[in-house]
Protein backbone atom coordinates (compact mmCIF):
# COMPACT_ATOMS: atom_id res chain seq x y z
CA UNK A 1 0.00 0.00 0.00
CA UNK A 2 1.39 3.39 -0.91
CA UNK A 3 0.45 6.63 0.79
CA UNK A 4 0.11 9.84 -1.17
CA UNK A 5 2.93 12.31 -0.61
CA UNK A 6 1.92 15.35 1.37
CA UNK A 7 3.54 18.71 0.85
CA UNK A 8 3.15 22.17 2.26
CA UNK A 9 2.41 23.58 5.67
CA UNK A 10 -0.39 21.16 6.52
CA UNK A 11 1.64 17.95 6.26
CA UNK A 12 0.54 16.77 9.69
CA UNK A 13 -3.15 17.33 9.03
CA UNK A 14 -2.86 15.81 5.56
CA UNK A 15 -1.26 12.66 6.98
CA UNK A 16 -3.86 12.46 9.75
CA UNK A 17 -6.65 12.78 7.17
CA UNK A 18 -5.09 10.14 4.90
CA UNK A 19 -4.56 7.65 7.71
CA UNK A 20 -8.03 8.30 9.13
CA UNK A 21 -9.56 7.67 5.71
CA UNK A 22 -7.67 4.39 5.43
CA UNK A 23 -9.01 3.38 8.84
CA UNK A 24 -12.54 4.32 7.80
CA UNK A 25 -12.18 1.90 4.89
CA UNK A 26 -10.48 -0.80 7.00
CA UNK A 27 -10.58 -0.30 10.78
CA UNK A 28 -8.31 -3.33 11.22
CA UNK A 29 -5.46 -1.87 9.13
CA UNK A 30 -2.66 -2.21 11.68
CA UNK A 31 -0.16 -0.25 9.59
CA UNK A 32 -2.51 2.73 9.27
CA UNK A 33 -3.42 2.58 12.98
CA UNK A 34 0.29 2.53 13.91
CA UNK A 35 0.96 5.43 11.54
CA UNK A 36 -1.87 7.47 13.03
CA UNK A 37 -0.60 6.83 16.55
CA UNK A 38 2.90 7.86 15.51
CA UNK A 39 1.67 11.07 13.87
CA UNK A 40 -0.15 12.06 17.06
CA UNK A 41 2.86 11.15 19.20
CA UNK A 42 5.27 13.11 17.02
CA UNK A 43 2.95 16.12 17.23
CA UNK A 44 2.93 15.91 21.03
CA UNK A 45 -0.72 14.81 21.25
CA UNK A 46 0.07 11.99 23.65
CA UNK A 47 -3.53 11.28 24.69
CA UNK A 48 -4.64 10.64 21.10
CA UNK A 49 -1.46 8.71 20.35
CA UNK A 50 -1.96 6.42 23.34
CA UNK A 51 -5.61 5.92 22.41
CA UNK A 52 -4.55 4.78 18.93
CA UNK A 53 -1.77 2.56 20.31
CA UNK A 54 -4.36 1.02 22.64
CA UNK A 55 -6.68 0.25 19.72
CA UNK A 56 -3.76 -1.13 17.73
CA UNK A 57 -2.57 -3.47 20.46
CA UNK A 58 -6.08 -4.59 21.43
CA UNK A 59 -6.70 -5.75 17.86
CA UNK A 60 -3.11 -6.89 17.17
CA UNK A 61 -1.53 -8.05 20.45
CA UNK A 62 1.67 -9.15 18.72
CA UNK A 63 2.31 -5.94 16.76
CA UNK A 64 5.69 -5.58 18.44
CA UNK A 65 6.61 -2.03 17.29
CA UNK A 66 3.39 -0.77 18.86
CA UNK A 67 4.60 -1.63 22.34
CA UNK A 68 7.95 0.06 21.94
CA UNK A 69 6.54 3.26 20.49
CA UNK A 70 3.66 3.34 22.99
CA UNK A 71 6.23 3.04 25.78
CA UNK A 72 8.26 5.89 24.30
CA UNK A 73 5.10 7.99 24.16
CA UNK A 74 4.33 7.15 27.79
CA UNK A 75 7.83 8.27 28.78
CA UNK A 76 7.34 11.56 26.91
CA UNK A 77 4.02 11.96 28.74
CA UNK A 78 5.84 11.52 32.10
CA UNK A 79 4.15 8.17 32.82
CA UNK A 80 7.17 5.90 33.46
CA UNK A 81 5.39 3.19 35.45
CA UNK A 82 2.94 2.66 32.59
CA UNK A 83 5.86 2.68 30.15
CA UNK A 84 7.52 -0.11 32.15
CA UNK A 85 4.37 -2.21 31.99
CA UNK A 86 4.06 -1.58 28.25
CA UNK A 87 7.68 -2.63 27.73
CA UNK A 88 7.20 -5.81 29.77
CA UNK A 89 4.21 -6.71 27.58
CA UNK A 90 6.20 -5.80 24.48
CA UNK A 91 9.13 -7.98 25.51
CA UNK A 92 6.76 -10.92 25.99
CA UNK A 93 5.27 -10.26 22.56
CA UNK A 94 8.71 -10.01 20.96
CA UNK A 95 9.67 -13.33 22.56
CA UNK A 96 6.50 -14.97 21.16
CA UNK A 97 7.34 -13.59 17.72
CA UNK A 98 11.02 -14.50 17.94
CA UNK A 99 12.03 -10.85 17.45
CA UNK A 100 15.24 -10.75 19.50
CA UNK A 101 16.24 -7.33 18.16
CA UNK A 102 13.04 -5.65 19.36
CA UNK A 103 13.26 -7.61 22.60
CA UNK A 104 16.77 -6.30 23.31
CA UNK A 105 15.81 -2.71 22.42
CA UNK A 106 12.82 -2.81 24.75
CA UNK A 107 14.88 -4.44 27.51
CA UNK A 108 17.47 -1.65 27.20
CA UNK A 109 14.72 0.95 27.43
CA UNK A 110 13.20 -0.83 30.43
CA UNK A 111 16.60 -0.90 32.15
CA UNK A 112 17.04 2.82 31.45
CA UNK A 113 13.63 3.72 32.87
CA UNK A 114 14.24 1.54 35.92
CA UNK A 115 17.34 3.46 36.90
Regions found by a protein language model. Name each.
Residues 21-22, 55-56, 90:
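Canonical positions in the second alpha-helix
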Amino acid sequence: MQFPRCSGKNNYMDRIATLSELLTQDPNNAFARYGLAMEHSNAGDFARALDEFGKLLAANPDYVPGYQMAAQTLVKAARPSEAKSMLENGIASAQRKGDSHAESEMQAMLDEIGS
